Regions:
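Gly/Pro-rich hinge or "lid" segments in bacterial periplasmic/extracellular proteins
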Residues: 76, 94-96, 192-248, 252, ...
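Alpha-helical secondary-structure segments
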Residues: 55, 134-141, 173-179, 183, ...
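Surface-exposed binding/hinge segments that line
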Residues: 49, 120, 155-204
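N-terminal lobe/hinge region of extracytoplasmic solute-binding protein
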Residues: 55-112, 143, 216-219
Length: 588
């Protein structure tokens, strides 16, 4: 999962149709975990305001397990900030199209007709054990380790038969050269941004990176020492060898559990937690008004839309009219207003106009996208009956004569999604689908559904990038395709859809630097999207960042916006972890 494509810490939904093949729908929201209280910083860490731990709580964590493997701990939101706090990338490409920020790679240059990328590395980086970070580590990481390790560690697709990467080599101790087979104008923002660098001298000895828990991590990030670990909270203290002079500006990070949106709210209201990415209903009344000078909320719309996603390889989700009818049957405005308290605007069936209006220029695309997203149960029923669906009384039957059923599963503490899935269930009942809400106790009871072949649908939100390319690439490209039953975190292809036409259009987009030709490819992809509707966008994906400046300033905010504002989004969180400063300095 990754702004990276598919980074959890975002809502999910799984849907199931009952017939020859039953379907399940799992809807997830922005928080979960057993209740916890704030722990105290280790005695070795000063408890002054300048050095107290920045305390965070997030969404979806059961009892913590000591797993700091950045390749496998990504299923839990707490595991997401392992990348950013411990492990770092080469170039930070912030969400929302902001300017790329040099990181471990301080400069880069394209040559050979834009097919060769040379990365010049920082020369003063050390791993937390004091060993220098060099091109050997970068080449090892980008290639996906050695041999069999690539099954777990190949984030760039270097070992895939269809890879566009011709070679990755070191050019001395502090430069790396990546040669591509064809031009890829999106390589840095959609491929290289997935990469984080691990120490070759540690990981080359790991026999099975899929099961390795990395209990004592060696990393290059700003917070690498596990100062305390319990099943309810843990503390990362700063890296004594960190390469950015004077950073991090704070002494430690602490992550604690919260069982629900309400319990997380209680923790931040009391001052026990400084930062959370949990939904807060009526946030002005419930939180910011309690201490206007210090309590803040920044709900940035820097992510792709929340969408209803189906396993398009399974019946009846392989039927385009069925997918379109579901889009027509869902009342997006009510979900936005009642389920999300107006913080998440409803989208069209295209889903990208809010984030990328400059890329949606065709009038026919706009009209069709609006029509498919207009709440109209009567039109939805006609779409279904025209496609061979029938009714037995008020019950919808698929073309094979089987009843259609969608059970919506949601973690009980995620109050916004409990409300939203109730609206969805009611909408589906109105067109004859047997739909009900099923409450799940925690993340561990829900998460296995995402990759199960028995549960072919989910609600998914991937991180925003500088253009719609990443959105279309995840959902239309043969190169991003992930077979049913496998984890699609790295590519975001949870609906298991692929398109030869979409792949060709994406290639056209990648292989040109001409903005007009890129726009032409984008418009063609938009038209293809509305023809096929592989997933159903519902509303803009908000990034719930609720934070207190009683002890810390310099958070990502409307006045200080530099990327995705939540702490689970890599690589943007690298910016937050190195910029957040003690109270008394400028900024919110």
């Amino acid at each position: 999962m990754s702004r990276s494509a598919g980074s959890p810490g975002r809502p999910w939904l799984t849907v199931t149709a009952v017939g020859a093949l039953a379907a399940l729908v799992v809807l997830v929201v922005a928080t979960v975990s057993p209740a916890a209280v704030r722990g105290t910083a280790p005695s070795a860490i000063s408890k002054t305001a300048a050095h107290k731990c920045l305390v965070m709580t997030g969404s979806g964590d059961p009892a913590f397990v000591r797993n700091f493997n950045p390749y496998t701990a990504t299923g839990l939101p707490s595991g997401q900030f392992i990348k950013g706090a411990l492990y770092e990338g080469l170039i930070v490409t912030p969400a929302g199209g902001l300017k790329p920020v040099p990181w471990l790679a301080r400069t880069w240059k394209w040559t050979n007709g834009n097919k060769t990328l040379t990365l010049n590395l920082a020369k003063n980086v050390k791993w937390s054990d004091g060993t220098p970070l060099t091109s050997v580590d970068v080449v090892y990481s980008l290639k996906g380790g050695n041999g069999a390790q690539a099954k777990t560690m190949d984030l760039l697709g270097y070992t895939r038969p269809d890879t566009n990467i011709a070679s990755i080599t070191a050019a001395g101790k502090y430069a790396v050269v990546i040669k591509l087979k064809t031009i890829d104008s999106q390589f840095i923002s959609t491929t290289l941004n997935l990469a984080f660098i691990v120490p070759q001298h540690i990981w080359a000895k790991v026999k099975n990176p899929a099961t390795f828990t990395n209990p004592h991590p060696v990393a290059s990030g700003p917070f690498t020492t596990i100062a305390r670990f319990t099943t309810q909270d843990y503390v990362f203290s700063k890296n004594a060898h960190y390469w950015q002079a004077g950073k991090p500006l704070i002494g430690c990070l602490e992550y604690v559990q919260a069982s629900s949106n309400d319990s997380a709210l209680a923790l931040i209201q009391s001052g026990q937690v400084d930062w959370t990415h949990n939904f807060v209903a009526n946030v002005d009344k419930a939180y910011t008004s309690k201490d206007p000078a210090h309590f803040h909320a920044f709900y940035a719309t820097t992510a792709y839309p929340q969408s209803l996603v189906f396993d398009t390889t399974q019946y009846p989700y392989n039927l385009v009219p069925f997918r379109k009818a579901l889009s027509q049957a869902i009342d997006r405005q009510s979900i936005s207003k009642l389920g999300e308290y107006g913080y998440a605007p409803a989208t069209s069936a295209l889903g990208i106009e809010f984030l990328f209006p400059q890329w949606v220029t065709d009038a026919s695309v706009k009209a069709q996208a609006k029509a498919l997203a207009t709440y109209n149960p009567t039109a939805a029923k006609k779409t279904l009956t025209d496609a061979g669906f029938t009714y037995k009384g008020s019950q919808l039957l698929d073309p094979k004569g089987n009843p259609v059923k969608l059970d919506i599963h949601v973690i009980s503490g995620w109050s916004d999604w409990v409300a939203s899935d109730q609206i969805i269930a009611k909408n589906l009942q109105a067109i004859g689908i047997d739909s009900k809400e099923v409450l799940e106790p925690d993340w561990n009871s829900w998460y296995p559904n995402a990759s199960s072949t028995k549960n072919p649908t989910l609600l998914w939100q991937v991180g925003g990038q500088g253009s719609p390319f990443g959105f279309f690439n995840a959902n239309l490209s043969n190169n991003a395709y992930v077979a049913p039953g496998l984890d699609a975190t790295n590519t975001g292809n949870w609906e298991h859809y692929k398109s030869d036409q979409g792949t060709a259009l994406l290639q056209q987009w990648k292989q040109t630097l001409d903005p007009s030709k890129q726009q032409a490819a984008a418009t063609a992809l938009e038209k293809l999207w509305l023809q096929q509707l592989p997933i159903v966008p519902l509303f803009v994906g908000p990034r719930w960042s609720t934070y207190s400046t009683r002890y810390f300033h310099c958070f990502d905010s409307p006045k200080n916006h530099f990327g995705d504002p939540i702490f689970t989004t890599f690589p943007d969180n690298s910016l937050s972890f190195t910029q957040i400063c003690p109270g008394g300095k400028a900024g919110q």
